[in-house]
């Protein structure tokens, strides 16, 4: 059963320490039920998952969005075949059930990354090659029924941001926390990857 935990809101941006504090605030019974973490690859979340030995499933949407941001139209136009090739290899790596069948694709992608002229794109590809297993844990642990994206959470956050903007801000973090809690209770559920519903507890 999936659940939405009551919100924890702190000042400042997203940080490693902030995520550590957020997870430390969870009760031990809840922490003990967590087996995996689906995230966008933020260092703080990766650190938390490693420290707590949780399975880490990285978001496919953020991966391809990152590639698009770093693969400019000019670069794509000049290296069309190469761009299509690494895109195809990545999709094969993150969707093929058999690990043995993708080893050659991982090796090919590693070689392609060495010759990429764009530093930013090369960095993303090398990062993917190092951590490709994190994008496949939904296949490795099918019994957990892990989503491959964080889209449901991103959508919920967007809804909260939209109504916060309409409210024109809050005087204190406490009042904001109360408002977000009420918003989540009113929403009642959120669809996760099209299969599971969650309830606020």
Predicted regions mapped to residue ranges:
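Conserved beta-strand -> loop -> alpha-helix junction used to position metal-binding or nucleic-acid-contacting
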Residues: 36-84
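Amphipathic alpha-helical
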Residues: 98-164
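Intrinsic-disorder/low-complexity, polar/charged segments
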Residues: 12-15, 19, 94-102, 169-173
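Short hydrophobic/aromatic segments of transmembrane alpha-helices and their interfaces
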Residues: 27, 49, 139-141
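Amphipathic alpha-helical/coiled-coil segments positioned at domain termini
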Residues: 54-59, 137-200
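Charged alpha-helix within mobile-element recombinases
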Residues: 79-117, 129-130, 160, 175-190
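RNase H-like nuclease fold core
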Residues: 1-39, 43-47, 55, 131-134, ...
């Amino acid at each position: 059963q999936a659940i939405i935990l009551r919100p924890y809101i702190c000042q400042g941006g997203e940080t490693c320490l902030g995520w550590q504090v957020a997870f430390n605030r969870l009760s031990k019974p809840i922490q003990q039920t967590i087996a995996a973490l689906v995230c966008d690859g933020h260092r703080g979340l990766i650190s938390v998952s490693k420290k707590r030995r949780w399975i880490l499933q990285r978001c496919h949407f953020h991966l391809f969005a990152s590639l698009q941001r770093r693969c400019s139209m000019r670069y794509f136009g000049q290296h069309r075949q190469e761009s299509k090739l690494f895109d195809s290899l990545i999709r094969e790596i993150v969707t093929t059930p058999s690990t043995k069948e993708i080893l050659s694709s991982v090796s090919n992608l590693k070689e392609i990354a060495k010759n990429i002229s764009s530093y930013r794109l090369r960095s993303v590809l090398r990062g993917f090659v190092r951590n490709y297993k994190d994008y496949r844990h939904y296949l490795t642990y099918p019994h957990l029924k892990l989503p491959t994206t964080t889209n449901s959470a991103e959508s919920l956050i967007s809804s909260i941001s939209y109504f916060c903007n309409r409210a024109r801000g809050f005087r204190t973090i406490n009042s904001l926390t109360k408002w977000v809690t009420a918003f989540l209770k009113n929403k009642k559920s959120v669809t996760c990857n099209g299969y599971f519903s969650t309830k606020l507890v």
